């Protein structure tokens, strides 16, 4: 469910007068996504996406998100482009919410990606990292090491309701990662949420990246580790080394990882698995019964975390010769 704020046709038509987008012919809510309210608009010019930013999105972060999409599109990356109003502003207001019009991106996300798709994802992620160079607005990653501690403090007391022994396992893991987290690897703007539903394909060709609302400044290789976790495990929890090899080789073909980044990848992958475990755990424990939100299983990412603990070097992810 991704329409938290309803809008009327009259409100929408009035909102659109602030833009040079033609006249509204139809609109409908989009069910996918969990953070914002999204609508697909058809106009006499082009199809558009209307996004109303809900309370979980900080209004002060919106210039970063919208500006980043503009910057990336100007650099040639295929991603949604925020449309300016007639007064030049990117952000408006509708139904009491900050709102923006975004260009419509053709494509669909893949339910069953193959290794060839993972290779394209690696290439696109590296292209995004390179294209983001020169983007001057900064946004720290609130879901890095310090954020993990905050999430765990909120969840620790009830964690064993999800699986017995979690309290004994997770606190030492956070402490270990905090003590060993790399500080001097290449950094820049990362997507931070490049899951399957945020990558569009037309056939086997990647048509674009979407949903930059977790983007922030952090280690570039950390973004690679997020993709390993999101794209390279099967439904039964097994790591698919063929997909991992393809994703890493695709990335390296555009932006080669340094020796230090490759060496850090198992640790970074533990960290990114922990990050999604903790946010899922918090949501699992705090989402009210009957809420129109599908709760995601935190234990999926606990199993990935445990897998990464067994990895001695990046060759085990599929990169031969490392």
Curated annotation (Swiss-Prot):
Keywords: Amino-acid biosynthesis, ATP-binding, Kinase, Nucleotide-binding, Threonine biosynthesis, Transferase. It comes from the Bacteria. Transmembrane segments: none annotated. It holds the Pfam family APH. GO terms for molecular function: ATP binding; homoserine kinase activity. Pathway: Amino-acid biosynthesis; L-threonine biosynthesis; L-threonine from L-aspartate: step 4/5. GO terms for biological process: threonine biosynthetic process. It is an enzyme of class 2 (transferase). It catalyses: L-homoserine + ATP = O-phospho-L-homoserine + ADP + H(+). Its EC number is 2.7.1.39. Belongs to the pseudomonas-type ThrB family. NCBIfam families: PRK05231.1, thrB_alt. This is Homoserine kinase.
């Amino acid at each position: 469910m991704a329409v938290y704020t309803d809008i009327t046709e009259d409100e929408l038509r009035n909102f659109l007068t602030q833009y040079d987008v033609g006249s509204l012919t139809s609109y409908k809510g989009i069910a996918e996504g969990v953070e914002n309210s999204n609508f697909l608009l058809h106009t006499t010019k082009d199809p558009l996406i209307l996004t109303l930013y809900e309370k979980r999105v900080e209004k002060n972060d919106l210039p970063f998100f919208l500006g980043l999409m503009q910057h990336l599109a100007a650099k040639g990356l295929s991603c949604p482009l925020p449309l300016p109003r007639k007064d030049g502003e990117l952000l408006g207001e509708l139904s009491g919410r900050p709102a923006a019009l975004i260009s419509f991106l053709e494509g669909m996300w893949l339910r069953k990606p193959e290794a060839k798709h993972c290779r394209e994802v690696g290439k696109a992620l590296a292209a995004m990292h390179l294209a983001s160079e020169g983007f001057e607005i900064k946004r720290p990653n609130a879901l890095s090491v310090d954020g993990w501690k905050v999430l765990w403090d909120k969840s620790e007391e009830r964690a064993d309701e999800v699986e017995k022994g979690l309290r004994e396992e997770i606190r030492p893991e956070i402490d270990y990662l905090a003590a060993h987290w790399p500080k001097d690897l290449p950094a820049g703007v990362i997507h931070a949420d490049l899951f399957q539903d945020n990558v569009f394909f037309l056939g086997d060709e990647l048509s674009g990246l979407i949903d930059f609302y977790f983007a922030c400044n952090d280690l570039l290789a950390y973004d690679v580790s997020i993709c390993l976790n999101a794209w390279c495990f099967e439904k039964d929890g097994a790591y698919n080394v063929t997909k991992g090899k393809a994703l890493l080789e695709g990335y390296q073909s555009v932006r080669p990882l340094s020796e230090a980044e490759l060496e850090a990848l198992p640790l970074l992958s533990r960290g990114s698995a922990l990050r999604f475990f903790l946010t899922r755990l918090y949501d699992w424990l705090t989402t009210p019964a009957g809420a129109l939100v599908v709760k995601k299983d935190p234990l999926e990412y606990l199993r990935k975390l445990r897998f990464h603990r067994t990895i001695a070097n990046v060759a085990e992810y599929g990169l031969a010769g490392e």
